[in-house]
């Protein structure tokens, strides 16, 4: 910095105000009518967003529930859910674990973090397993592991392909 720039900087008055972040206007709309994109902040009509498979124009992909993914993938009405495996819910006896599972079941409407079943795509049969991150962050416990293994055994015994969508937060 030369001498002239130093003098100019010395006599410049500092800003006496602090810029405030603009608040976004609140939209008075019925619950669930609009969905805001966390990436571009655009407000979508939820129905239109769902018709676009939950993908915003900016490219952001909203999380999908297991049943939504199944409905997008397989032929309409072809999905037959497999019965869940019989495994101990809390084999390591973690405290409050059963209560957490109960809350997740009530909140999500699914039994565990994976949904498995038989379906068709363009009339071709297959076995599909879809993990749902809403349930214990899609983590893999004994039930999830056994459900996937059982689905693969079923597919193998019938010579069917397996499609597996993972959305796991790890093991539990």
Q: Over which residues does each language-model region extend?
A:
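Terminal-region recognition feature
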Residues: 2-172
């Amino acid at each position: 910095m030369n001498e002239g720039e130093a003098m100019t900087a010395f006599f410049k008055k500092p800003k006496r105000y602090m810029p405030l972040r603009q608040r976004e206007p609140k939209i008075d709309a019925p619950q669930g009518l609009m969905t805001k994109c966390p990436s571009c902040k655009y407000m979508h009509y939820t129905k239109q967003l769902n018709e676009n498979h939950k993908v915003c124009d900016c490219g952001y992909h909203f999380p999908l529930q297991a049943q939504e993914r199944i409905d997008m993938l397989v032929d309409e009405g072809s999905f037959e859910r497999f019965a869940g495996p019989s495994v101990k819910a809390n084999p390591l006896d973690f405290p409050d674990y059963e209560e957490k599972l109960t809350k997740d079941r009530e909140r999500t409407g699914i039994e565990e973090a994976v949904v498995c079943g038989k379906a068709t795509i363009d009339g071709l049969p297959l076995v599909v397993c879809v993990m749902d991150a809403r349930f214990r962050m899609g983590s893999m416990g004994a039930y999830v592991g056994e459900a996937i293994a059982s689905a693969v055994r079923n597919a193998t015994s019938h010579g069917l392909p397996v499609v597996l969508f993972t959305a796991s937060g790890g093991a539990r």
